């Protein structure tokens, strides 16, 4: 009785098996390929501050979240567009045209903030001091920066034109009075900014630095109210421009009244919805808190808009208190 011998693989089959094993084996860790980085899936990587890595043109990514039926936005809110624009621009310290918009509502005169010596002061006095410190510090960093002052009550007024001399802006910063405001004309504010400034245009967003950038800093404090605003086509282009930034410091009462239709959180979220690029900074400070909070917020706005990371990735701690948090945060 003959026993069948097990079939031996041919030379061709052995070569195919060796090729499959080599293709499945990851590349060795070399100096040009540390930790096998080139073999990792690119889609699983997340870049910190990818908005301004210095390469890549403005791109858009679809937002997969859909609103549930019947849960539409409130009438006073501006719904963000479906595609979220992600901007990548060169990280350069080009000149800034900073337009500081100061709210002059009567809430700014309420002595609720706690000053450094423990006494009570109002938000207007603190805002005036922190604006002057901001302008003078930015001027020391780069003397080509220009500044303008706009006051906001029921209407908007352009008090100081764009100037590189901090003394010109500070000369009209302190002779201001608050007033009772019934509405907030946000549309008029942006229309005034469009009239007074011109946004730069470059041939290639990814490689050519702009001659300057335009940044608006709104220091706002009043009860939540329906702003007068409609997103026109020129305003939409302004917000989508990679060289325009809209920073907000919102001073609120810190309490939500049940009988009110809106809360300060709704108003703060509305301000944030205007930034479709994710490049602006938004801060909220309680009116009854310490004045130091306001100064800290203004100090964080000293960074150049093209050189700072996204706000969610920014960290201002010098000590690594939380190892896990510091791994995903970019220290400024």
Swiss-Prot record:
Subcellular location: Cytoplasm; Nucleus
Positions of the UniProt region annotated as Disordered: 1-88
Biased composition (Pro residues): 70-83
Principal subcellular localisation of the protein: cytoplasm
Acidic residues biased stretches: 10-23
One BP annotation, GO: DNA repair-dependent chromatin remodeling
Record bears the keyword Cell inner membrane: no
Domain notes: The VWFA-like region is similar to the VWFA domain. Its presence reveals similarities between the structure of the 19S proteasome and the BRCA1-A complexes.
Name the UniProt record assigns to this protein: BRISC and BRCA1-A complex member 1
Species of the source: Bos taurus (Bovine)
